[in-house]
A protein has these predicted regions:
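An N-terminal-biased, well-structured beta-alpha scaffold segment characteristic
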Residues: 1-92, 194, 214, 220
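Structural signature of beta-strand start/N-cap positions in the alpha/beta core
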Residues: 2, 24, 90, 143-145, ...
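Structural/interface elements that position substrates and couple domains in central-metabolism enzymes
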Residues: 2-7, 12, 22-26, 99-101, ...
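Structural detector of well-ordered beta-strand residues that form the stable sheet scaffold
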Residues: 4, 67-70, 90-92, 130, ...
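Rossmann-like adenosine-cofactor binding region
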Residues: 54-58, 172-241
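Phosphate-coordination loops involved in phosphoryl transfer and adenosine-cofactor binding
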Residues: 66, 140-143, 215, 224
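Phosphate-binding beta-alpha-beta segment of Rossmann-like dinucleotide-binding domains, i.e.
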Residues: 87, 94-143, 155-158, 162, ...
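Glycine-rich Rossmann-fold phosphate-binding loop(s) that bind the pyrophosphate
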Residues: 149-150
Length: 241
């Protein structure tokens, strides 16, 4: 099998293929769209990250020998999964690859926001002492709303509980009577918007989650609510924010 790699993979990742002599790997980083169209049928599989878009236009030209699209990442929003499925092409991703990293980054952003860390750092770097300008908020006892309790959402919820926050969550694929093995209240989406002091989003980008955070949902939220999005950008309507 010949595999095309169009985006950056670590040396360790590429070395995994060396164990299989029947696999030939061709790394072509930053392959532009027209070049991809001209060479893609020389391979039976492609591995991408975020830069390469495997949309219906590309997938439609794939011949019958093409077997697999692999994305080295969590989401597959840059792959037209429906078009691939119609041609019998397998689409794979790595849903747990960056779960811990993303959960930790979410909490890092949370502390930065409530403690005004970037602003205070910039002030100190400018050789100023403006201590009273950067008073923060205490997180203990605050209501922390998680939208999406998948691999990442659960890890974030665990960390929020460790800080002493009350955690509420919504996930349409988890029933309210599910035992989560942690003290998280499963509630309707509207309750998350209304009750949370902090809202964090951990969903894929789909037609159902695009602009999930927009004018309608924002109007339900508390004044001064903190919104953290470590998922896909399209989930939050930035103009409405």
């Amino acid at each position: 099998m010949k595999i095309l790699v169009t985006d950056g993979l670590s040396k360790e990742g590429l070395e995994l293929f060396a164990k299989y002599p029947e696999i030939e790997v061709d790394v072509r980083k930053k392959t532009d769209r027209e070049e991809l169209k001209s060479i893609i049928n020389n391979y039976q599989a492609v591995i991408i990250r975020s830069a390469t878009k495997m949309d219906s236009e590309i997938i439609d030209i794939l011949d019958d020998n093409f077997k697999l699209i692999g994305r080295a990442g969590i989401g597959v929003d840059n792959v037209d999964v429906s078009a691939a499925s119609k041609k019998g092409i397998i689409v794979m991703n790595t849903p747990s690859a960056n779960a811990i990293t993303t959960a930790e980054h979410t909490i890092a952003l949370l502390f930065s926001l409530v403690r005004n860390i970037p602003q205070a750092f910039a002030s100190m770097k400018a050789k100023k002492w403006e201590r009273s300008s950067f008073q923060g908020k205490e997180l203990y006892g605050k209501t922390f709303g998680v939208i999406g309790l998948g691999n990442i959402g659960r890890l974030v919820a665990e960390r929020a509980l460790g800080i002493g926050m009350k955690v509420i969550a919504h996930d349409p694929f988890i029933s309210k009577d599910t035992n989560l093995n942690m003290p998280v209240d499963l509630v309707d989406m509207e309750e998350v918007f209304k009750d949370a002091d902090i809202i964090t989003v951990h969903t894929p980008l789909t037609s159902g989650t695009k602009n999930l955070i927009s004018k309608g949902s924002i109007n339900l939220m508390k004044d001064g609510v903190i919104i953290i999005n470590c998922a896909r950008g399209g989930i939050v309507n930035e103009e409405d924010i």
